[in-house]
């Protein structure tokens, strides 16, 4: 049968499909037959037949059949893929003679129609179908990938394998591929062995146990693989590096480290990995945890879609999601919209159109993968708006009004910036202000363990002289009490050691000046202080201490021995009267610090803070050793009596140039401190004690010398001596401004109260050109007391020349 005979037979059937050429009309016309019957040549008679309701139903049935065929064959594939071999052979012949047969074919059709049906020839008309029907058909059949179409086609052509089994009665029967179904999870398996192995997962049974350990396994091969661990057998060896492995998979995975192969790719960001576990970890950490955030934002972003921005309203994350997850997110977003029914239908149609567009374009990225991944991490993780983000990830213009509703977590970066600004401010303050004002109050209390009772001391600047004095006089207004608790003394030792550790660990040079008022115990008394105020008793003010600490960074750790400190603490904590009549300043924790023997007035802590005397680095060890010896001898000198000397006075040397022009103290006022003595003691000092001369170099220019100088004229009274000591430094050495203050000189008001008390010899520190000399009053200083003259005659003998030593 030739082509003409087939054509005549089809034309006699009056079928609309029969008008098509069998060899090449099946393809394009059938695709168009779902919608429009595109370029089909029809006569007027056929148009009337097509409008007949019965024939129209037939057309709908044929359209549904064609839709089913397209579902099986796939969208975009022409129907000639399903034509039989005979038709394909005819198609090949007609394709060769395509140019020749086309004109003749149309001529034959017109002639046949003219003679058989007696109808006009060559009248073309397109059958128009409403757009709503076309849209409904498109909604019924969403777009699919070509790869999915090929898979479905192969699945249709391949018939399921039939398994021939022998029943119990001996008859043969066919069995389905997966007839063994699990009772727990309804999973189907091909054999009973696989089913039983799967059931072990639910029951927890592990029948295979290792002989060398207690581990059990579900399968036997797992046990055999585990036994290789005990035997040390590693049959698989790498060819490049020689490493051996128990499993072949491990060896292949190891070889990828040599070759650099990364066969596994992330579905989200298209990043490649060499191992599957790393892909899973990357997907779990970077993407799957963020799907929830994307879904939440999609719910809020979906009402903002408009027909103008449908192509760009999707976030950057949606385009990178797989198709199934993308459909789920779109379904959830559509379900969460609360709008009228009409709006729902319109928006659903627009969503489906955009899904078709995305399915055809496969969500091609609009920007590079690297920048996409970077922006995606920042946006989804911290919700930070990037100014240079690509168009796909930018928010819409309509979303700007919804910023108040959407409140994602934001990244706070103020902590690091504040630290940097804090450091810069600290540096600027240290450059512009004095060392005292450059340290904040928090830093000072950190090193002083919150022993600062007067906060006004930390805010003093050194440039105004009298203003600082007045501020400190106001601050020191409350009376303080004394206690002899030994725990306070031990607490002082602990604080000292902490200061040593804090300064030893730091490598940068800094000077931390701490001035505090320790008002609880006389054990930690560093200096006796007074305020020029007649209303405040001297007994109260003598219990107020000023701790002057100046810490210099030093790599050496030469400090005072613990034995010396312990003896000091034991001595002062066990005193009966609770008042420390003598105070040696052990406040300096480093050798580089000055040995500050401090008896300054309470109204001049600025002097104590600014004063700094440094010892030469080469003489640190010897200086510390001799000073400790001096302290031990002083303790031996005072250990026989509870109270040391009645006229004990420590002088404070101030080298500050800021106080040169104006003295801080009025020399017309004198304050007395009534001492308490036991009359049973013969002498507070041992007569056989040597009087060594300790010359301690504290600064490169000045030195403190302690000598037993007894050349004080007897005609000078204590009052005149005090006035001379106050005014003498300005007369002798105008360049080194030094001021001397005594606080416990006897006054006429208190001399009558102690007529029978034994008064000792008071070693005093006098200043001459920057040196402090230790001397005692002569016998005529206190003519009222005869015992003083007796003790002075014992000690005014000529000193031994060998006992005077100088350390420098």
UniProtKB/Swiss-Prot annotation:
InterPro entries: Znf_C2H2_sf, Znf_C2H2_type
GO molecular function, one term: RNA polymerase II cis-regulatory region sequence-specific DNA binding
Any Gene Ontology CC annotation: nucleus
Zn finger limits (C2H2-type): 180-202, 208-230, 236-258, 264-287
Compositionally biased tracts (Basic residues): 150-159
Sections of the chain in a coiled coil: none
Keywords noted in UniProt: DNA-binding, Metal-binding, Nucleus, Repeat, Repressor, Transcription, Transcription regulation, Zinc, Zinc-finger
Location, primary (coarse class): nucleus
PROSITE patterns documented for this protein: ZINC_FINGER_C2H2_1, ZINC_FINGER_C2H2_2
Record carries keyword Electron transport: no
Composition skew (Polar residues), residue ranges: 705-718, 725-736
Biased composition, class Acidic residues, residue ranges: 56-73
The keyword Metal-binding belongs to this UniProt entry's keyword annotation: yes
GO biological process: hemopoiesis; regulation of transcription by RNA polymerase II
Segments of this protein annotated with the region Disordered: 15-86, 131-162, 305-338, 596-617, 705-736
Location relative to the cell: Nucleus
Family, per entry: Belongs to the krueppel C2H2-type zinc-finger protein family.
Function: Involved in transcriptional regulation. Represses the transcription of a number of genes. Required for primitive and definitive hematopoiesis during embryonic development.
Note: Knock-down of the znf148 mRNA disrupts both primitive and definitive hematopoiesis, but does not affect primary blood vessel formation. Most embryos die before four days after fertilization.
Name this polypeptide is given: Zinc finger protein 148
């Amino acid at each position: 049968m030739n082509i003409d005979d087939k054509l005549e037979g089809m034309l006699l059937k009056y079928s609309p499909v029969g008008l098509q050429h069998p060899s090449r009309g099946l393809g394009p016309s059938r695709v168009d037959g779902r919608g429009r019957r595109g370029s089909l040549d029809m006569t007027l008679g056929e148009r009337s037949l097509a409008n007949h309701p019965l024939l129209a139903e037939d057309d709908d049935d044929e359209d549904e059949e064609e839709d089913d065929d397209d579902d099986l064959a796939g969208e975009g594939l022409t129907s000639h893929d399903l034509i039989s071999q005979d038709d394909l052979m005819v198609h090949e012949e007609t394709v060769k003679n395509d140019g020749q047969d086309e004109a003749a074919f149309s001529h034959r059709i017109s002639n046949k129609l003219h003679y058989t049906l007696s109808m006009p020839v060559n009248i073309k008309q397109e059958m128009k179908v409403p757009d709503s029907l076309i849209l409904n058909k498109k909604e019924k059949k969403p777009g699919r990938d070509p790869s999915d179409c090929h898979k479905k086609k192969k699945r249709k052509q391949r018939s399921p394998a039939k398994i021939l089994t022998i029943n119990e009665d001996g008859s043969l029967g066919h069995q389905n591929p997966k007839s063994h179904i699990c009772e727990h999870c309804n999973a189907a398996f091909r054999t009973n062995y696989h089913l039983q192995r799967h059931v072990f997962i639910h029951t927890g049974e592990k029948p295979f146990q290792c002989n060398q350990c207690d581990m059990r396994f579900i399968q036997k091969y797992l046990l055999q693989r585990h036994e290789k661990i005990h035997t040390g057998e590693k049959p698989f060896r790498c060819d490049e590096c020689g490493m051996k492995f128990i499993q072949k998979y491990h060896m292949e995975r190891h070889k990828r480290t040599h070759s650099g192969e990364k066969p596994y790719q992330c579905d989200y960001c298209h990043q490649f990995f060499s191992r599957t576990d790393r892909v899973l970890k990357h997907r779990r950490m970077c993407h799957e945890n963020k799907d929830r955030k994307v879904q939440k934002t999609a719910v809020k972003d979906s009402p903002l879609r408009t027909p103008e921005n449908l192509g760009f309203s999707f976030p950057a994350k949606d385009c990178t999601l797989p198709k199934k997850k993308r459909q789920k997110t779109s379904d959830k977003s559509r379900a969460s919209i609360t709008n009228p029914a009409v709006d729902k239908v319109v928006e659903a149609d627009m969503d489906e159109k955009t899904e078709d567009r995305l399915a055809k374009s496969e969500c091609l990225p609009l920007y590079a993968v690297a920048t996409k991944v970077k922006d995606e991490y920042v946006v989804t993780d911290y919700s930070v708006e990037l100014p240079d983000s690509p168009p796909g990830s930018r928010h819409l213009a309509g979303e700007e009004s919804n910023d108040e509703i959407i409140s994602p977590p934001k990244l706070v970066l103020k902590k690091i910036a504040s630290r940097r600004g804090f450091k810069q401010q600290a540096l600027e303050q240290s450059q512009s202000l004095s060392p005292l004002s450059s340290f904040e109050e928090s830093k000072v209390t950190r090193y002083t363990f919150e022993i600062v009772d007067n906060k006004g001391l930390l805010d003093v600047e050194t440039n105004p002289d009298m203003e600082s004095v007045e501020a400190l006089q106001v601050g020191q207004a409350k009376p303080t009490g004394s206690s002899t608790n030994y725990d306070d003394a031990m607490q002082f030792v602990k604080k000292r050691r902490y200061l040593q550790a804090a300064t030893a660990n730091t490598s940068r040079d800094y000077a931390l000046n701490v001035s505090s008022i320790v008002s609880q115990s006389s054990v930690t008394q560093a200096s006796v202080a007074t305020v020029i105020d007649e209303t405040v008793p001297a007994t109260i003010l003598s219990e107020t201490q000023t701790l002057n600490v100046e810490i210099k960074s030093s790599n050496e750790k030469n400090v005072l021995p613990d034995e010396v400190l312990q003896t000091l603490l034991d001595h002062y904590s066990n005193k009966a009267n609770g008042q420390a009549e003598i105070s040696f300043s052990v406040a300096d924790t480093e050798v580089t610090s000055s040995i500050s023997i401090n008896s300054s007035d309470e109204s001049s802590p600025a002097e104590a803070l600014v004063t700094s005397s440094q010892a030469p680095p080469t003489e640190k060890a010897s200086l510390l050793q001799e000073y400790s010896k001096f302290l031990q001898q002083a303790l031996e000198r005072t250990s026989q009596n509870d109270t040391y000397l009645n006229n004990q006075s420590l002088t404070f040397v101030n080298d500050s140039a800021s106080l040169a022009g104006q003295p801080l103290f009025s020399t017309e006022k004198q304050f007395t401190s009534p001492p308490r003595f036991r009359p049973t003691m013969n002498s507070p000092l041992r007569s056989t004690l040597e009087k060594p001369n300790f010359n301690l170099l504290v600064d490169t220019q000045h030195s403190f010398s302690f000598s037993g100088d007894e050349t004080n004229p007897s005609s000078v009274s204590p009052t005149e001596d005090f006035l001379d000591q106050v005014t003498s430094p300005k007369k002798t050495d105008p360049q080194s401004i030094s001021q001397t203050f005594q606080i416990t000189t006897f006054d006429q008001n208190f001399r009558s109260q102690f007529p029978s008390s034994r008064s000792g010899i008071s070693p005093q520190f006098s200043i001459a050109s920057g040196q402090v000399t230790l001397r005692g009053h002569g016998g005529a200083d206190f003519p009222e007391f005869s015992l003083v003259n007796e003790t002075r005659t014992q000690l005014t003998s000529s000193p031994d020349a060998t006992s005077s030593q100088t350390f420098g």
